[in-house]
Amino acid sequence: MSTNVVSIKDIKREKHAIDASGKILGRLATEVATILMGKKKPTFVPYLDIGDYVVITNASKIKLSGKKMKDKIYTRHSGYPGGLTVETFDKVIVKKPEFIIEHAVRGMLPQSKLGRQMIKKLTVFAGPAKGEVKEEK
């Protein structure tokens, strides 16, 4: 018995279209991260990027459970003294709804070059898709 080693030319990528309206952020992000990593493929190996492409539409209609709409915070720092900016989920979803899903998915991918390569296969739209996208789920 021998082990099959996957080569880059053998990788076949599909395009998954997911509608985020009414879905809970964390559950959607885990589903997307699994697809981007290719974990459900029989040829999965942790050192290769064999995942599929994912297009998410209606990011502005995502939901959170509980009181997280007001309690969840996003922070960033400018690098200057006193440069900490704190925003709640309510404010961020209005300004840049794409960022919320990208941020959640990025945290579930490997924190390495491979993870940075995987996140490039994710496309998020705030509203309906631009162009032609095949729907799934």
Give residue spans per PLM region.
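Ribosome large-subunit tunnel/peptidyl-transferase-proximal elements
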Residues: 1-103, 113, 126, 131-137
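Positively charged, solvent-exposed patches that mediate nucleic-acid binding
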Residues: 119
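Acidic, metal-associated active-site segment
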Residues: 106
